[in-house]
From Swiss-Prot:
Keyword ATP-binding: yes
Binding-site list for ATP: I254, G255, S256, G257, E258, F259, G260, S261, V262, K277
Protein name: Wee1-like protein kinase 1-B
Record-listed E.C. numbers: 2.7.10.2
Domain Protein kinase: start-end pairs: 248-518
Tissues of expression: Zygotically expressed. Present in oocytes and postgastrula embryos (at least until the tailbud stage). Expression begins at the midblastula stage and increases after the early gastrula stage.
Catalytic activity: L-tyrosyl-[protein] + ATP = O-phospho-L-tyrosyl-[protein] + ADP + H(+)
Quaternary structure, from the entry: Interacts (when phosphorylated at Thr-186) with pin1.
InterPro entries given in the database record: CC_SR_Kinase, Kinase-like_dom_sf, Prot_kinase_dom, Protein_kinase_ATP_BS, Ser/Thr_kinase_AS, Wee1-like_protein_kinase
Post-translational modification: Phosphorylation at Thr-186 during M-phase by cdk1 inhibits the kinase activity and leads to interaction with pin1.
Predominant location: nucleus
Transmembrane segments: none
Organism per entry: Xenopus laevis (African clawed frog)
Keyword Nucleotide-binding: yes
Length: 595
């Protein structure tokens, strides 16, 4: 393709200098390469750090990257416009006659151009849209472009600079996609994943139909980044300062488990006490990383409930996961059971019913979110000895928000999974239901009921449960071990029903919170409490009426008692007056008033 050069007359600012003809040559792009001809290295632009440009700069006596004026004014790619020769020769650069032969000419080493080169700045999308390097299409160029797109190799126009930019790593601030975790326990996670699949399908169709269209390489990259699914952020070392040391003051270590250790800390800002769980070993890339993230996901979805340990925040430091939770001043149920076993003092039946009812309410809330805990046991039940206000959280009609002295809360949500798409991580085998061991995940909520029954039975004084063996199988067959206290038969029957070998026969968490055994003695339903309250209010209203009547009668009696004394006092005063001080010559008026 032949392009006729066009002469451009430039009038210099110095009137003593003769005008010069500045020739512009256009080189072929890589789209019109002939077999055995140029490979596109002689394009309009060249990388400043390439060996060819460095050699040319040394021969011409230029500093790397262009003239000294260009280096002073350079602020980004395309920020310095193409200057006329007169603009170059008005500065402190060499004279016009010395640099006149250096105007752009066709040389074996490639063309030179006064356009400043800036290797550190990536080509901008808006700069490409100017199409400064496009040439009229020929049938051969269109066919070659169609073949390039069909082979999924989108080629850049513009020569070496853009091909090198394609190979170079893309800056994070240009096409970076926000990396966020997708919470698997939220309903939106399914919509996000499905929408990502639809976007990928649309992109494939777009690439197949784009052979005859003029597509920009940068646009394709940007679209690919937009529809790419979000990547999971691993637990890696943070660049920030230690948040644990900056925001919290550690008081003591209050527990240790398989995951890590729990510390009692005071937040420096608000002065409140929190429980911060820190993993024992780095979790990045380990098996426990998924469990740690699952616990954070579950806490974030569940929010606040009086019978679930409250979650505040979580972060990673030095590849360790830290979770800030509510501090329960009563410790765990496992600690209380161990102390009771040592002192031979066990939970009474009313206390066992209270424990069962409160934990069942927590499970009801978790199950209502289509989640299951899968690791209910005494060490994951925490005790708070503070009284909850009656306006804390709205419960069901038959549930009481809590006015007792002890509040039981469910914690350690590392094994929580979704009912619809379970990813079961087996918990403690001592409290594990048999169907879960057999990988039957159709009744996962009933597995939590099974574990709750054994937890309550352990608080009643039962021996530590086995991890396997004949006794383990006997319990899965519905046989409870003996306890060192006498319990009512109806309560024992409820516990046996909760560990039934058939998961369908076990009561649900909703049925447990309404069970008559749990609401008979120590607990009353909200409806019963309302009836009793209305009766007391009616009695109180009657008593107030009687009190008002008594007060009125007493006031009337006192008034009648003082009435004769006032009459006698007035008559005596009138008799003692024989003369009048004023109006002696006037007749006294007669009044019929008693006073």
């Amino acid at each position: 393709m032949n392009v006729q050069p066009r002469n451009m007359n430039v009038q210099p600012r110095n009137m003593n200098v003769q005008p010069v003809r500045h020739k512009l040559f256009f080189s072929d792009t890589d789209e019109e390469e002939e077999d055995g001809h140029s490979t596109g290295e002689d394009s309009a632009f060249q990388e400043s750090d390439s060996p060819v440009s460095r050699q040319r700069e040394k021969q011409e006596g230029k500093p790397p990257g262009g003239t000294w004026e260009e280096l002073e004014e350079e602020e980004g790619f395309g920020s310095s416009p193409i200057k006329s020769p007169g603009d170059f020769f008005m500065s402190d650069s060499p004279s016009y006659r010395q640099l006149a032969p250096a105007s752009p000419t066709r040389s074996p080493q490639g063309p030179t151009s006064p356009i400043p080169e800036c290797p550190g700045t990536p080509p901008h999308k808006t700069f490409r849209k100017l199409r400064l390097f496009d040439t009229p299409h020929t049938p051969k160029s269109l066919l070659s472009k169609a073949r390039g797109i069909g082979s999924s190799a989108l080629r850049f126009r513009g020569g070496t600079l853009f091909r090198e930019a394609e190979k170079a790593p893309k800056p994070e601030f240009v096409y970076s996609t926000p990396q966020v975790n997708i919470n698997p326990f939220t309903p939106d996670s399914l919509e996000i994943q499905s929408s990502a699949g639809l976007c990928r399908g649309r992109k494939r169709a777009l690439l197949n139909d784009s052979c005859g269209e003029d597509m920009e390489g940068s646009d394709c990259e940007l679209e690919d980044e937009d529809i790419r699914p979000a990547k999971r952020i691993p637990i890696t070392e943070s660049n920030m300062k230690s948040r644990y040391a900056t925001e919290f003051h550690e008081l003591e270590k209050i527990g240790s488990g398989e995951f890590g250790s729990v510390f009692k800390c005071v937040k420096r800002l608000d002065g409140c006490i929190y429980a911060i769980k820190r993993s024992k070993k780095p979790l990045a890339g380990s098996v426990d990383e998924q469990n740690a993230l699952r616990e954070v996901y579950a806490h974030a979805v569940l929010g606040q409930h009086p019978h679930v340990v409250r979650y505040y925040s979580a972060w990673a430091e030095d590849d360790h996961m830290l979770i800030q939770n509510e501090y329960c001043n009563g410790g765990s149920l496992s600690d209380v059971i161990s102390e009771n076993y040592r002192t031979m003092q066990y939970f009474t039946e009313p206390e066992l019913k209270d424990l069962l009812l409160q934990v069942a309410r927590g499970l009801k809330y978790i199950h209502s979110m289509s989640l299951v805990h899968m690791d209910i046991k005494p060490s994951n039940i925490f005790i708070s000895r503070t009284t909850l206000p009656n306006t804390a959280v709205e419960e069901a009609d038959d549930e009481e928000c809590g006015s007792g002295k002890v509040i039981y809360k469910i914690g350690d949500l590392g094994h929580v999974t979704r009912v619809s798409s379970p990813q079961v991580e087996e918990g403690d085998s001592r409290f594990l239901a048999n169907e879960v061991l057999q990988e039957n995940y159709t009744h996962l909520a009933k597995a939590d009921i099974f574990a709750l029954a054994l937890t309550v039975w352990s608080a009643a004084g039962a021996e530590p449960f086995p991890t396997n063996g004949d006794q383990w199988h006997e319990i899965r067959q519905g046989k409870l071990p003996r306890v060192p206290q006498l319990l009512s038969q109806e309560f024992v029957d409820l516990i046996k029903l909760m560990i039934s070998p058939d998961p369908e026969k076990r009561p649900s968490s909703v049925a447990l919170v309404k069970h008559s055994v749990l609401l008979s003695a120590s607990r009353k339903s909200a409806e019963q409490l309302r009836i009793e309250l209305d009766a007391e209010k009616f009695k109180n209203a009657l008593l107030q009426k009687e009190l008002k009547k008594a007060q009125i009668a007493k006031a009337a009696a006192e008034e009648r008692a003082h009435f004769p004394d006032r009459i006698a006092t007035r008559s005596t005063t009138q008799n003692n007056r024989t003369t009048r001080l004023i109006g002696k010559k006037m007749n006294r008026s007669v009044s019929l008033t008693i006073y």
